[in-house]
């Protein structure tokens, strides 16, 4: 009976698929946030004039194209930005 109960609990957890969400760094990389559903990429935004210091980090659904003034770097693993 205990085995059956344990099996049911495991199957329930697997079927519910508690969901995996991406974790992305905030502007200060010591801190991160859990991304909302659908935002599966992390990004860093730089000013082209200074590519060493990011001005924004976070979660995003689609990586924006870089422009003459702003460069975006996107990745798809936890805290990769």
Swiss-Prot record:
Keyword check for Secreted: yes
Record-level Gene Ontology MF annotations: toxin activity
Tissue specificity as recorded in UniProt: Expressed by the venom gland.
Location within or outside the cell: Secreted; Target cell membrane
Domain of life: Eukaryota
Disulfide partners: 24-42, 35-59, 63-74, 75-80
Signal peptide: 1-21
Complex and partners: Monomer in solution; Homodimer and oligomer in the presence of negatively charged lipids forming a pore with a size ranging between 20 and 30 Angstroms.
Protein name: Cytotoxin 4N
């Amino acid at each position: 009976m205990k085995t059956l109960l344990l099996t049911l609990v495991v199957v329930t957890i697997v079927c519910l698929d508690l969901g995996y969400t991406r974790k992305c760094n905030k502007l200060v990389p010591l801190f991160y946030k859990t991304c909302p559903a659908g935002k599966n990429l992390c990004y860093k935004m730089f000013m082209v004039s200074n590519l060493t210091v990011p001005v924004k980090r976070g979660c995003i659904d689609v990586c924006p194209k870089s422009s003459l003034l702003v460069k975006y770097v996107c990745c798809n693993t936890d805290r990769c930005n």
